[in-house]
Amino acid sequence: MADKKGSNSEKLLYCSFCGKSQHEVKKLIAGPSVFICDECIDLCNEIIRDEAAAAGVEASLSRSDLPSPQEIRDILDQYVIGQERAKKILAVAVYNHYKRLKHLDKKDDVELSKSNILLIGPTGSGKTLLAQTLARLLNVPFVIADATTLTEAGYVGEDVENIIQKLLQNCNYEVDKAQRGIVYIDEIDKISRKSDNPSITRDVSGEGVQQALLKLVEGTMASVPPQGGRKHPNQDFIQVDTTNILFICGGAFDGLEKVITDRTEKTGIGFGATVKSKQDRDAGEVLRDVEPEDLIKFGLIPELIGRLPVVATLGKLDEAALMKILVEPKNALVKQYHKLFAMERVELEIRPAALQAVARKAIRRKTGARGLRSIIEQALLDVMYELPTMKGVSKVIIDENVIDGDGKPLLIYEDTPKVAGSN
């Protein structure tokens, strides 16, 4: 091994790969008539790691032991509470999709079509989390796109091919990996056309975007600028085939239940008519009856609906489900805050009544599971601010009064209880 420090009388040595001298690098390792520096070794290690990761993804999607629908469902259960029917639908759809990719090279008379997925459910019901968990389970590139930021090509805003650009960025521009990834398009309901009749006016963020998404979802060669640059003439583009990318579209579809109810519960006229209350059925139950015609009436174009054949509906989360979400999943919020407080060598206790108060508040705000963190963060703000400078605190207790804003956390100083903020 040659050290970079040497006397002037010694012959100057150079790296055989990058050409740097022994004085420009930390170490120069000698072989038979060849030298390699520490920087080139690091670069080689990085290349090997990347290729091993790519091979691992390829193997995970082509191996015979692809997770079964039941195994996929079991893993989803660890992260997502409730939504049993939606998890079953997703497990089968994703299993069939990657099973189809395994058999692409086999010549057969029967060609298997791609089954993209549409998730319908209220805010905070777990749509995004389901898609994220699936991507993590399958170890494939994943990207979330917001449909409300998309516009038709030529207008100010993001065009649909930016979605593929983000997917490429997430896998270091490895095209083969990107072509087997998962794209989640959120707020798909926000780009519905304003009426169920085709408009004669330009709708740059509605029907026009749906038409542009249609090509991407069904499979096309997307042209993406290299390394995230903007498109301009005389530029080489990266070509990405979207045929085998799994697209999952999600949205709250507020008002869709009324469209379904109007179709399914036609009311009669006269004394013999059956009068049904539209409040008799839960919104989640109503959404299960969704048909393509309802989505068309809501404002999605028929062609796009046809490219999203798998429809899974998610129900509104009740108080019991929200309480479970707080404590049961692997990355449950309460477990996260326990860990944060443990870093300060303090035990955190959130009492069951406090969890119930958090769930009730989230229901009142109509934010679902998404609003749970902000409620807990607000309740713990003062104590998290003061705790790092406090001495001798061993435990913090949170009850329902803290969540409702009527009290402060109880601090345990060795054997003496004390209220936060009191002197």
UniProtKB/Swiss-Prot annotation:
Gene3D superfamilies: 1.10.8.60, ClpX chaperone, C4-type zinc finger domain, P-loop containing nucleotide triphosphate hydrolases. It comes from the Bacteria. InterPro entries: AAA+_ATPase (IPR003593), ATP-dep_Clp_protease_ClpX (IPR050052), ATPase_AAA_core (IPR003959), Clp_ATPase_C (IPR019489), Clp_protease_ATP-bd_su_ClpX (IPR004487), ClpX_bact (IPR046425), P-loop_NTPase (IPR027417), Znf_CppX_C4 (IPR010603). GO terms for cellular component: HslUV protease complex. The keyword Repeat does not apply. GO terms for biological process: cell division; proteolysis involved in protein catabolic process. Zn(2+) binds at C15, C18, C37, C40. ATP binds at P122, T123, G124, S125, G126, K127, T128, L129. Keywords: ATP-binding, Chaperone, Metal-binding, Nucleotide-binding, Zinc. One of its GO terms (molecular function) is ATP hydrolysis activity. Residues 3-56 form the ClpX-type ZB domain. ATP-dependent specificity component of the Clp protease. It directs the protease to specific substrates. Can perform chaperone functions in the absence of ClpP. Belongs to the ClpX chaperone family. Component of the ClpX-ClpP complex. Forms a hexameric ring that, in the presence of ATP, binds to fourteen ClpP subunits assembled into a disk-like structure with a central cavity, resembling the structure of eukaryotic proteasomes. HAMAP family: ClpX (MF_00175). This is ATP-dependent Clp protease ATP-binding subunit ClpX. It comes from Burkholderia multivorans (strain ATCC 17616 / 249).
